[in-house]
Amino acid sequence: MSKRDYYEVLGVSKDASERDIKKAYKRLAMKYHPDRTSGDKELETKFKEVKEAYEILTDAQKRQTYDQYGHAAFEQGGGGGGHGGFGGGHGDFGDVFGDVFGDIFGGGGGRRQSRQQRGSDLRYNMDLSLEEAVRGKEVEIKIPTWVGCDPCDGSGAKAGSKPKTCTTCHGAGQVQMRQGFFAVQQTCPTCQGQGQIISNPCDSCHGQGRVEKTKTLSVKIPAGVDTGDRIRLTGEGEAGMHGAPSGDLYVQVSVREHRIFVRDANNLHCEVPISFTTAGLGGEIEVPTLDGRAKLKIPSETQTGKMFRMRGKGVKSVRSGAIGDLICKVVIETPINLNERQRELLEELEESMGKDSSKNRPKEQGFFDGVKKFFDDLTK
């Protein structure tokens, strides 16, 4: 029998907030919990279904995977969280409600989170030139962080000794207290949630299982990255305490402004100045690209602001592999520092056009015709 949609199981919409999901879970878990249903197998199955849906939808990464691939992502060990993950029997009452009520009563997360407190994630800002972002590169970076302690292998205990299981919480890291009908979990005051006691702490890390150190990493920047892109290095964040998993390192990319090109997604834009004679007569010019110089044909009678698209001269997409274009906007440059002969030639050109130059300068003529009509309308 196919599984029901997790959102349907909890009775929430696909865009439900984590708070709404917890609220729905609390209501349904109380309704179907085996301690309240007298061993009804059908209701016990529903309870497991509710618990499974809750565990997937309150984990941001698992929820994203589920939204994209559905139940298939978690079958045959693909993502965890299936019915097989519950084990036999009814489980611990506090294990069910711990993560729901922990925030309310200050008890922290459920018991499975107490002993494995993952290290914090880190962020590194990577500043790149446009050329580096487009071509990709390998960068060596230095990160001040927490790393696992070598002498004690992350346990926190001195060589030759071992951490002992906490006798107060029996290794759970949390203790229960009854408040009416509910059994609420709180952090164990003896071991501070670690589930173990270190009688002989390591001299290097003083019992933490980790030490501060500047770590050197080699980061491969893929070709085509852009400002706002983020590269995740799994397990390269801070080491957790007492051998707990490390967090992740996120490299945040920022691309500096370029003096010639402006990037728009996978396209590049640039302004290319041309002489007024090239604009009028046409010709061939050289334009810059990220691969070197390229030829661009300018047709005669080109006006300033005209765009020319050079296919495949842009940026290769880091995701799809498609290559963008280079879009050149021509700007006609007015000559300066004219000598006497050059001025004479320009004057001859002006005279050759005659008084009626509308066919040579249609935009200018159209503008002044519009101005004349504007003032004529004002005086009517």
Curated annotation (Swiss-Prot):
Q: Binding residues for Zn(2+) 2, per the UniProt record? A: 166, 169, 188, 191
Q: Tell me where it resides.
A: Cytoplasm
- Matching Gene3D superfamilies: DnaJ domain, Heat shock protein DnaJ, cysteine-rich domain, Urease metallochaperone UreE, N-terminal domain
Q: Which domain of life is it from?
A: Bacteria
What the entry lists under InterPro entries is as follows: DnaJ (IPR012724), DnaJ_C (IPR002939), DnaJ_domain (IPR001623), DnaJ_domain_CS (IPR018253), HSP40/DnaJ_pept-bd (IPR008971), HSP_DnaJ_Cys-rich_dom (IPR001305), HSP_DnaJ_Cys-rich_dom_sf (IPR036410), J_dom_sf (IPR036869)
Note the segments forming the CXXCXGXG motif repeats.
Answer: 149-156, 166-173, 188-195, 202-209
Start and end residues of each CR-type zinc finger?
Answer: 136-214
Free-text comment on the cofactor: Binds 2 Zn(2+) ions per monomer.
Q: Which residues form the J domain?
A: 5-70
The terms describing its cellular component in GO are: cytoplasm
Pfam families xref list: DnaJ (PF00226), DnaJ_C (PF01556), DnaJ_CXXCXGXG (PF00684)
Question: What family is this?
Answer: Belongs to the DnaJ family.
The record ties this protein, via NCBIfam families, to: DnaJ_bact (TIGR02349), PRK10767.1 (NF008035)
* Subunit: Homodimer.
Tell me, what does this protein do in biology?
A: Participates actively in the response to hyperosmotic and heat shock by preventing the aggregation of stress-denatured proteins and by disaggregating proteins, also in an autonomous, DnaK-independent fashion. Unfolded proteins bind initially to DnaJ; upon interaction with the DnaJ-bound protein, DnaK hydrolyzes its bound ATP, resulting in the formation of a stable complex. GrpE releases ADP from DnaK; ATP binding to DnaK triggers the release of the substrate protein, thus completing the reaction cycle.
Domain text: The J domain is necessary and sufficient to stimulate DnaK ATPase activity. Zinc center 1 plays an important role in the autonomous, DnaK-independent chaperone activity of DnaJ. Zinc center 2 is essential for interaction with DnaK and for DnaJ activity.
Protein name according to UniProt: Chaperone protein DnaJ
This protein's species is Pseudoalteromonas translucida (strain TAC 125)
